[in-house]
Amino acid sequence: MSKPFKLNSAFKPSGDQPDAIRRLEEGLEDGLAHQTLLGVTGSGKTFTIANVIADLQRPTMVLAPNKTLAAQLYGEMKEFFPENAVEYFVSYYDYYQPEAYVPSSDTFIEKDASVNEHIEQMRLSATKALLERRDVVVVASVSAIYGLGDPDLYLKMMLHLTVGMLIDQRAILRRLAELQYTRNDQAFQRGTFRVRGEVIDIFPAESDDIALRVELFDEEVERLSLFDPLTGQVESTVPRYTIYPKTHYVTPRERILQAMEEIKDELADRRKVLLANNKLLEEQRLSQRTQFDLEMMNELGYCSGIENYSRFLSGRGPGEPPPTLFDYLPADGLLVVDESHVTIPQIGGMYRGDRARKETLVEYGFRLPSALDNRPLKFEEFEALAPQTIYVSATPGNYELEKSGDEVVDQVVRPTGLLDPIIEVRPVATQVDDLLSEIRQRAAINERVLVTTLTKRMAEDLTEYLEEHGERVRYLHSDIDTVERMEIIRDLRLGEFDVLVGINLLREGLDMPEVSLVAILDADKEGFLRSERSLIQTIGRAARNVNGKAILYGDKITPSMAKAIGETERRREKQQKYNEEHGITPQGLNKKVVDILALGQNIAKTKAKGKGKGRSTAKAGIVELDMTPKALQQKIHELEGQMMQHAQNLEFEEAAQIRDQLHQLRELFIAAS
């Protein structure tokens, strides 16, 4: 099923890219465990990495610091590798409240979560691709270091079907039930099967557009065919097919029974400890909760919060790392850590926060001590599991630089010829009035401005002041959710307003070529928000505009400011020299606004073509591409209802058109999920 990686791009590497690609590939072939790609904003870092993947033909995981950047990378990689498996693996929770206990108020908070089904399907698709083929790029968030089902058990639970295989219908149905598929003869949806005489239709959990029909004759598999679950039209017949479990957390029955005995042993030991310490309430609470879970596991094969018993279910010893997405990545896989100066500290912090919450639950009798082993990876475990790694950042952290030694690959020259912003330092005393006049100059020529302040209060006051003086301004702060944040950035690019004020939310993130001025207030206040890395990242937001400029308001030049200005000047001089040598005139980027959200859009269109003769492709069109994420979500719910109505009325042509449109809208919505 694997194909070689085939890079699809109208451009050839240029600027610093050819040298960066060569050095990274040589380092990987020489067996270097760590390399750093120091690439400035707009230098084509993703294109460089895509070239390395295509040349070396190795399965790759790309780690991004948040869902927004993961979505952007997923869209870019899907464009570079349309014929290969580009997968998306982020947390599938739209909302997640972990269970917790607050001793001071004696409050227990139950676990509460809302799962995004589309992202769950994409996660299952990602692990399937890693197990089945080598031409895989998985774009993941830090969700990749959290516990996942054991790959060995996952592989053991698969159902392999081949034409001519001797197996009766009841055996297939029993195996499907073990894989947590449910029978539903009325509503055929993902993770279900239906039975009609000797025919079993199965809708694989990792698929959203193809189902399997198993035709039996006299306890023998006579035919296996793939069909469109909506129209019922057969796409092709296959000699064999593998059904993957509905969830990553399936466990064979014998393993569950063995785990139950181990849980009972731990419960008995823990009860003795609690009684010895005169913790009678905690002992009763723990016994009651655990016995209930054991009964559920015995009857149903799972229970609410079964992940807290994952150590027993996967057969690990106390303190051993949980199985994660890294266990699915082949031994010769490649890891790319994007925006590594943010992602690496995130990985280090996940374990500590999780541990503190669970220790309280164990101490007060809500969970057994083994629940502490249901956790994300510790940083040292991540280091041990990580394959050969490339760290990508415009401002690499000390960790990456230390690990890479001399292997820091510079990518400072942009193929577009764009120069780093001109930097000016101006006094603090007149910063607000000076900023107002700069904003008016930019607004007059239809360009945008980003302003970063030190405190929330100052951001609010500045926004109010600018509004009073007639400027079109918005304020971006930590209380705004992902969906609304993307709406604000989109509106800024479309020119709905001219100025965006924020604190620490304007650094690493989406490309905004329309921004020509970045103003940093109180730049001379040394600290986290005004460190060398923060300043370089913030200045870089204006690096995609031909008129890019950064104004640092400060009464003195701090060491961080001096380093940031020096590094920006170095990059600017190198680009200027390259432009002169090659006769390049800097060109601004004309990136469509819909690119922020348009993930896999072309792929969705391609899928829609030719799925049955005579079908007209859905006009997913222009209207939807310009919609806000909230409107997209509303539109998706509306269309799903229409699609099911058409299917019930046997109007399969119309239902299929809407289904193709839903494909595209769901891809667009991923960025904000």
Swiss-Prot record:
Gene3D superfamilies: 6.10.140.240, P-loop containing nucleotide triphosphate hydrolases (3.40.50.300), UVR domain (4.10.860.10)
Chain ranges of the Helicase ATP-binding domain: 26-183
Helicase C-terminal domain: residues covered: 431-597
InterPro entries: Helicase/UvrB_N, Helicase_ATP-bd, Helicase_C-like, P-loop_NTPase, UVR_dom, UVR_dom_sf, UvrB, UvrB_inter
GO biological process entries: nucleotide-excision repair; SOS response
A GO molecular function held by the record: helicase activity
CDD domains the UniProt entry points to: DEXHc_UvrB, SF2_C_UvrB
UniProt feature coiled coil, ranges: none
GO cellular component: cytoplasm; excinuclease repair complex
Domain of life assignment: Bacteria
Keywords, in A-Z order: ATP-binding, Cytoplasm, DNA damage, DNA excision, DNA repair, Excision nuclease, Helicase, Hydrolase, Nucleotide-binding, SOS response
UniProt cross-references to SUPFAM superfamilies, sorted A to Z: C-terminal UvrC-binding domain of UvrB, P-loop containing nucleoside triphosphate hydrolases
Sequence motif: Beta-hairpin, positions: 92-115
This protein's record includes keyword DNA repair: yes
Ranges of residues in domain UVR: 633-668
Binding site residues for ATP: 39-46
Cellular localization per UniProt: Cytoplasm
Purpose of the protein: The UvrABC repair system catalyzes the recognition and processing of DNA lesions. A damage recognition complex composed of 2 UvrA and 2 UvrB subunits scans DNA for abnormalities. Upon binding of the UvrA(2)B(2) complex to a putative damaged site, the DNA wraps around one UvrB monomer. DNA wrap is dependent on ATP binding by UvrB and probably causes local melting of the DNA helix, facilitating insertion of UvrB beta-hairpin between the DNA strands. Then UvrB probes one DNA strand for the presence of a lesion.
PANTHER family on file: UVRABC SYSTEM PROTEIN B
Quaternary context: Forms a heterotetramer with UvrA during the search for lesions. Interacts with UvrC in an incision complex.
Similarity comment text for this entry: Belongs to the UvrB family.
Comment text on domains: The beta-hairpin motif is involved in DNA binding.
Name under which the protein is recorded: UvrABC system protein B
Organism: Salmonella paratyphi B (strain ATCC BAA-1250 / SPB7)
Classification of source organism: Bacteria, Pseudomonadati, Pseudomonadota, Gammaproteobacteria, Enterobacterales
Gene name in the database record: uvrB
